[in-house]
Amino acid sequence: VLILGYVYGKRLPVACGLKDLFGWSRLFVSRFFGTSAPVIANEFMWGLGTTMYSLAYGRMGDEAVAAITIATTIQDILVVLFQGLSAATAVILGNELGAGHLKRAEKYAVHFFILQFIATVGVAVVLIGIRWPIIGLYNITPEVARDVSLCILIFAAYMPAKMFNYVNVVGVLRSGGDTKMCLFLDTSGVWFIGVPLAFLGALVWRLPIYTVYALVMTEEVYKAVLGYIRYRQKKWLRNLASDVG
């Protein structure tokens, strides 16, 4: 309510009337669902895949579950920074692409990748340095604490690939409507690599939790390689609204 009041009170460009809200052309509807449907499917399949990770970890015993839960909780706090960066990337690039400034959008994408890399290195170094004081806040056994520490080190090692994927998939590729490729990257990475390796490592090979976690994280490298190739193809570098009435 506050946001709507501000938008219409200030008569911002998005303060449109009912005619504008519901005056959809057939091309607009087709473009909207063609772009948004893969995003919805992407989030659903990715969320379901991460649930499967939890099922695999849950079969490894209480200590393994405790270790991975603590490690991922610590990691999730840090990931918020890159989620915000990827969202900012999508907004800024989407604005430039919508205005037809394709060259500027391409330049900004490079800047965001550089910013992401610098932030990743900085956060990874800090995380490695403070992991033991943070782990010390938990009342856990030395064995669980060791596993948490190893999981955090593994996460730090994979951070460049994982955070690149955040900015590339959510910020760059989606801003240009390349959502089908985003769906392919996330779904294939989770379901063809991450989930099979999680269950193989946990139930068949009987590996320690940190080794299973390292196997699962290889999906980020897969997505980073294919995602970078897709980024270089520049199929995302387009104005989605140029011909929509």
Language-model-detected regions and their locations in the chain:
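Short alpha-helical transmembrane segments in multi-pass integral membrane proteins
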Residues: 1-36, 93-158, 201-245
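Hydrophobic positions within alpha-helical transmembrane segments of bacterial inner-membrane proteins
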Residues: 44, 48, 120-128, 163, ...
